[in-house]
Amino acid sequence: MTAATKATEYPSAVAKARFVRVSPRKARRVIDLVRGRSVSDALDILRWAPQAASGPVAKVIASAAANAQNNGGLDPATLVVATVYADQGPTAKRIRPRAQGRAFRIRRRTSHITVVVESRPAKDQRSAKSSRARRTEASKAASKVGATAPAKKAAAKAPAKKAPASSGVKKTPAKKAPAKKAPAKASETSAAKGGSD
């Protein structure tokens, strides 16, 4: 039983793009970024993805969302990319002429991209809000609570007084002593003096 024939419990819509001029391996690299995400998130990710395969994949996801809205009457805000995969299409074989009468084979690979979107209702209000938004709210609340406590401690502590500056005497930095040379070895000195033993 394949993913396309498997019955789902949520209403869904399908879109396919066949004979897309991108290799399946490169298409799968982009597809893995959006599997399981909402349609709006998936399209945002693909809009900024630098891979060339992101264009055709985004087009198929948008088509599946339009199919769900027009044919199934589903709410586009609840659509999730449930299943997405790229199968290998036919490979066109071409020849690249090379030096000395040789010819190299070029394989122009194609893909069949399939997208299934499902209308999944939001679980609750908490899950609808992104985790990033929850973290920022929590940090703002913590900073408000934390900001009042250090202010009280600072007010209780007396400020430290600085030592008065000396009158007119300018300090100069201390000079470093020159490095000492290591003493010469005894065997080297006897050889240098001409002692041959």
Swiss-Prot record:
Question: InterPro entries under this entry?
Answer: Ribosomal_uL22, Ribosomal_uL22_bac/chlpt-type, Ribosomal_uL22_bac/org-type, Ribosomal_uL22_CS, Ribosomal_uL22_sf
List all Basic residues biased stretches: 172-183
State which residue ranges cross the membrane. Answer: none
Arranged from A to Z, the UniProt key words for this protein are: Ribonucleoprotein, Ribosomal protein, RNA-binding, rRNA-binding
According to its UniProt entry, what is the function of this protein?
This protein binds specifically to 23S rRNA; its binding is stimulated by other ribosomal proteins, e.g. L4, L17, and L20. It is important during the early stages of 50S assembly. It makes multiple contacts with different domains of the 23S rRNA in the assembled 50S subunit and ribosome. The globular domain of the protein is located near the polypeptide exit tunnel on the outside of the subunit, while an extended beta-hairpin is found that lines the wall of the exit tunnel in the center of the 70S ribosome.
Q: What is this protein identified as?
A: Large ribosomal subunit protein uL22
Family listed = Belongs to the universal ribosomal protein uL22 family.
Say which domain of life the source belongs to: Bacteria
A GO CC term attached to the entry:
cytosolic large ribosomal subunit
* Presence of the UniProt keyword Cell cycle in the record: no
Q: Which GO BP terms apply?
A: translation
Ranges for region Disordered: 118-197
Subunit record text: Part of the 50S ribosomal subunit.
Q: Which Gene3D superfamilies match?
A: Ribosomal protein L22/L17
Q: Which GO terms describe its molecular function?
A: rRNA binding; structural constituent of ribosome
